[in-house]
Amino acid sequence: MKFALTGGGTGGHLSIAKALAIELEKQGIEAIYLGSTYGQDREWFENSPLFSERYFFNTQGVVNKSFFKKIGSLFLQAKAAFKAKEILKNHQITHTISVGGFSAGPASFASLLNKIPLYIHEQNAIKGSLNRYLSPKAKAVFSSYAFKDKGNHVLTSYPVQNAFFDCARTRTEIKHILFLGGSQGAKAINEFALLNAPKLTKQGIKITHICGSSAHERMRFFYQELGLLDKVELFAFHNNIIEVMHRADLCVSRAGASSVWELCANGLPTIFIPYPFASNNHQYYNVLEFEKENLCYVVPQNELLPKKLFEVIRKLNQKDDQGNKNLTTISTKLQQKIAKDGAKTIIETILNA
């Protein structure tokens, strides 16, 4: 028995691949990885001991491109698919798991050509174009969101690494705020952090700001101009996001699915600013259920005024009918919403199929 994991591009997809790879390793099952040279796949897995072999194809996405660029991207995908077909055959792969993203294309299609059972994890509440096409052809589609077209869909807990649960805690007071722009940074969140930093630090609230590598020097300059560089923990990227989340009492974040569920597992109340240009507005739908259950605050990017942060802080400090702070109630309920061992459930479901 040997698995192939494929897909990625961004940290959200790749964190799922990592969680599944860790579970396969625990169960003593060998796995290889197939991704792309474009995006973050190499950064995550080029030297990862979780995989016996790693392959990166020269591929790019097709969505939101001009006609001729789409043709070029499809040609690269097709070329890579035939390479992937040989790789899967040579490794005698028995199961393929796609975590989505454009880099999942070649190995997913190669698996279908080789008649290898294909399993898909759909991380978002709205399916991406590749998963929409491949879902009917897959053995099963795992997701933490309920889809209307149930078919071969399996509802599971999100495959969050156990460390996020292990470092969870119930928040009782807002002493530390984390501004989290995602793996690629977020200009709107960066500016929101800068505008609120003077008042927050004046009130004695600590700030950790992960701004993305492209904005790091600029953010450093602005904090220095504000005289706050020594009062703000500023990072382009942080290797231990679990520890950073654990220390925070409130988070401001995009609404990529992996971030949403990791914050949930950690019990960290969050203000979500969905990326407005995400395909099919999927980031908004990722947190819609949370918002309906009063487990988060959602602020559209075009309404992101500095006063919004303090409005939310004020609401979180108010007490509910039982005399508990809303902050504490939300933190407690978040930890109850997601079950541990989502990755284990997915792997065992596949093995028992």
Swiss-Prot record:
Enzymatic class: transferase
Catalysed reactions, semicolon-separated: di-trans,octa-cis-undecaprenyl diphospho-N-acetyl-alpha-D-muramoyl-L-alanyl-D-glutamyl-meso-2,6-diaminopimeloyl-D-alanyl-D-alanine + UDP-N-acetyl-alpha-D-glucosamine = di-trans,octa-cis-undecaprenyl diphospho-[N-acetyl-alpha-D-glucosaminyl-(1->4)]-N-acetyl-alpha-D-muramoyl-L-alanyl-D-glutamyl-meso-2,6-diaminopimeloyl-D-alanyl-D-alanine + UDP + H(+)
Subcellular location: Cell inner membrane
Keywords tagged on the record: Cell cycle, Cell division, Cell inner membrane, Cell membrane, Cell shape, Cell wall biogenesis/degradation, Glycosyltransferase, Membrane, Peptidoglycan synthesis, Transferase
Residue pairs linked by disulfide bridges in the UniProt entry: none
Membrane topology label: Peripheral membrane protein
Pathway: Cell wall biogenesis; peptidoglycan biosynthesis
Positions with a binding annotation for UDP-N-acetyl-alpha-D-glucosamine: 10-12, 124, 183, 283
GO molecular function: UDP-N-acetyl-D-glucosamine:N-acetylmuramoyl-L-alanyl-D-glutamyl-meso-2,6-diaminopimelyl-D-alanyl-D-alanine-diphosphoundecaprenol 4-beta-N-acetylglucosaminlytransferase activity; undecaprenyldiphospho-muramoylpentapeptide beta-N-acetylglucosaminyltransferase activity
Protein name as catalogued: UDP-N-acetylglucosamine--N-acetylmuramyl-(pentapeptide) pyrophosphoryl-undecaprenol N-acetylglucosamine transferase
